[in-house]
Swiss-Prot record:
One annotated GO biological process: regulation of DNA-templated transcription
Protein name: MSL complex subunit 3B
Compartments in which it is found: Nucleus
Domain MRG: 2-350
Principal location: nucleus
Length: 356
């Protein structure tokens, strides 16, 4: 099959983030502290919830006849691809699988290779299930929505560099081709113009995992979208509490859909097994996930999609990168980068990674 050209626009704020990421890793020899405070599974799950609630409010604000058009002769509302929650879920699951497979191949700089080998070793990170389960149970008593609307405080975005390095705008001018160069990466180069490829390809595995790390503060912004009919200061979306006014004005079916998606998980609670090392999406965060979007056009160009399906997929990717851009300060704190000497990985003193 002939490879086709696929275009995926990256917002300017994320292009600058890619340049900064390259600068921190290759010029200042810093590494992203692992496991990330907000890992990729958490980001993807947060996006699905954000997507579902945004779509619900958008549909509720439009006149009924605009979103209840019958599909063909069936009495089923037509849902555009960009509003389809099931497609959104499939998209994030595809991102998870693709990230886990491609990270060691094309998403790491050479300086990060040693860190990757250590963090994916089975004895470096140990999953602690019991304490996390107890914590989650106590949180569930508050209802899923309260956990999302009142998350724990994310990493500080105010930490400043203590070195005398040039300011960000200057280094961005010095490295204007960061995004473009990532798209044409070649193996084992040590500068900002390339991402490395490993010499061997690991067997693809459909890893499944979960975590109890906190979500960023993005859901605090959703409180502003509570319908005017609501008089509750602490929204609760669980069906068990009858008479909750949070989604007064919504159809009962839509309220149930939102309740369902707020409790939705990307992967089962019992994965990965405790005797296996966690997959990359369990450990890495937004910094490395963003690099995947530089590579996606090339990856998609080699896959067999119909034009209709590809168009729908690209629309969902576009919405997702806009989401990353909107909550850029939450997902990309400067404090995520630390000196290599501060990154301690010891098989004698393994670090704990929470599991649900």
């Amino acid at each position: 099959m002939e490879e086709r050209t696929v275009t995926l626009e990256i917002p300017e704020v994320l292009k600058r983030q890619l340049e900064d990421d390259c600068y921190y890793i290759n010029r200042r020899k810093r590494l992203v502290q692992l496991p990330c405070h907000t890992n990729i599974i958490t980001i993807l799950e947060s996006y699905v919830k954000h997507f579902a609630i945004s779509a619900a409010f958008s549909a509720n604000e439009r006149p009924r006849h605009h979103h209840a058009m019958p599909h063909a002769s069936m009495n089923v509302p037509y849902i555009p691809a960009e509003k389809n929650i099931d497609l959104c879920k499939e998209m994030v699951d595809g991102l998870r699988i693709t990230f886990d497979y491609t990270l060691p191949l094309v998403l790491l700089y050479p300086y990060e290779q040693a860190q990757y080998k250590k963090v994916t070793a089975s004895k470096v990170f140990l999953a602690i299930k019991e304490s996390a389960t107890n914590t989650n149970r106590s949180q569930e008593k508050l209802s899923p929505s309260l956990r999302l609307l009142n998350p724990s405080r994310p990493q500080s975005t105010e930490s400043q560099s203590t070195s005398g390095e040039p300011a960000t705008p200057k280094r961005r001018k010095a490295e204007p081709q960061a995004v473009q160069s990532l798209r044409r990466s070649s193996p084992h180069t040590a500068n900002c113009d390339r991402l490395s490829k490993s010499s061997t390809s690991p067997q693809p595995k459909r890893w499944q995992q979960d975590m109890s790390t906190s979500v960023p503060k993005l859901f605090l912004h959703l409180e502003k979208k509570t319908p005017v009919h609501s008089r509750s200061s602490s929204p609760t979306l669980t069906p068990s509490q009858e008479g909750s006014p949070v989604f007064a004005g919504f159809e009962g079916r839509r309220t149930n859909e939102i309740n369902e998606v707020l409790s939705w998980k990307l992967v089962p609670d019992n994965y990965p097994p405790g005797d296996q090392p966690p997959p990359p999406s369990y450990i890495y965060g937004a910094q490395h996930l963003l690099r995947l979007f530089v590579k996606l056009p090339e990856i998609l160009g080699k896959m067999s999609f119909t034009e209709k399906n590809l168009k729908a997929l690209l629309k969902h990717f576009d919405l997702f990168v806009r989401f990353l851009a909107e909550y850029h300060d939450d997902f990309f704190p400067e404090s995520a980068y630390v000196a290599a000497s501060e990154v301690h990985y010891s098989t004698r003193n393994p670090q704990a990674v929470n599991k649900c």
